[in-house]
């Protein structure tokens, strides 16, 4: 299959000559927090001369424990993201979990993200597609890379070809994932635009009993491997203080380390392009 044309989301091109980055905290911990993170990441990316889409979740709907923090809700979250995108002049993305959420988020959000566990939910895919927005589908931990063809066929049948896939690891026994770099090759070979999610790929699902743990120290290494293997962009969740993060702290990259990781990833992309 011929390679898809670049997917343009605001000023960011996924599948173009420059690598795209999707960056931001796991969850909106508060309005002040998400604004602070957006501004700081924007400054870092401007200095590094990289193109990025700002990501933050308004609801973590699949938390391991009922006691875990989930977020601030779809309406408030989308209002905040819309304002960030408008005022800071950057495209924004967030994940949607139901057809109704897709419809609501589609009014404000540049790119809708389909969670990995929901990647085959036809009604959700239809609702997201019918917004006309770009769609980033997280490949389920249970799917082979060639199985994304069925998801692509659904989205195209629903009238939307503005989508990409994100590799975020494959189930590897209990409480563990493995990042198979061959997946990037096979999905791109099939003609799809492909992002690599470095931080979720190092998760240990349920590894802390009532929450997910992970090996965040490995996320930059996997990002470098993915860029060298060949992908259209890198997804990384970052936090100003991962130890105190309200969700996915063990996997997020410290904000202070983001500049050096971006420099390295840009250099690798230049070397293999």
Spans of model-derived segments:
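C-terminal alpha-helical cap/extension of soluble enzyme domains
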Residues: 54, 208-273
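Glycine-rich, proline-tolerant flexible connector loops at the mouths of alpha/beta enzymes
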Residues: 22-34, 52-74, 239-249
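Alpha-helix-loop-beta-strand connector modules within alpha/beta enzyme cores
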Residues: 39-48, 67-93, 128-134, 184-194, ...
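N-terminal small/glycine-rich loop or linker at the start of catalytic domains
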Residues: 10-28, 57-67, 193-208
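Catalytic alpha/beta core domains of metabolic enzymes, predominantly
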Residues: 132-238
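N-terminal amphipathic alpha-helix/helix-capping segment at the start of soluble metabolic enzymes
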Residues: 1-21, 79, 270-273
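Catalytic beta/alpha-barrel core
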Residues: 71-73, 87-101, 110-123, 134-145, ...
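Structural preference for beta-strand elements that scaffold enzyme active sites
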Residues: 18-22, 51-55, 91-93, 110-111, ...
């Amino acid at each position: 299959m011929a390679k898809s044309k670049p997917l343009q989301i605001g000023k960011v091109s996924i599948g173009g000559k420059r690598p795209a980055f999707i960056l931001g905290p796991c969850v909106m911990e508060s309005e002040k927090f998400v604004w602070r993170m957006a501004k700081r990441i924007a400054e870092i990316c401007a200095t590094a001369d990289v193109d990025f889409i700002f990501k933050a979740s308004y609801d973590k709907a699949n938390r391991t424990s009922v006691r875990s923090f989930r977020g601030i809700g779809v309406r408030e979250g989308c209002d905040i993201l819309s304002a960030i995108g408008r005022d800071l002049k950057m495209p924004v993305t967030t994940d949607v979990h139901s057809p109704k959420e897709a419809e609501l988020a589609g009014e404000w959000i540049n790119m809708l993200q389909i969670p990995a566990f929901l990647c085959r939910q036809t009604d959700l895919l239809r609702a997201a597609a019918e917004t006309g927005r770009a769609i980033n589908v997280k490949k389920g931990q249970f799917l082979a890379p060639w199985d994304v063809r069925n998801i692509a066929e659904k989205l195209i049948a629903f009238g939307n070809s503005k989508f990409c896939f994100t590799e975020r690891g494959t189930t590897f026994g209990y409480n563990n994932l493995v990042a198979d770099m061959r997946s990037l090759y096979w999905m791109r070979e099939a003609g799809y635009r492909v992002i690599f999610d470095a931080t979720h790929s190092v998760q240990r699902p349920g590894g802390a009993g009532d929450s997910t743990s992970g090996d965040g120290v490995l996320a930059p290494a996997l990002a470098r491997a993915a860029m060298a293997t060949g992908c259209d962009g890198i997804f990384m969740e970052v936090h100003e203080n991962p130890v105190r993060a309200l969700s996915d702290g063990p996997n997020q990259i410290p904000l202070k380390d983001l500049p050096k990781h971006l420099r390295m990833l840009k250099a690798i992309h230049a070397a293999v392009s």
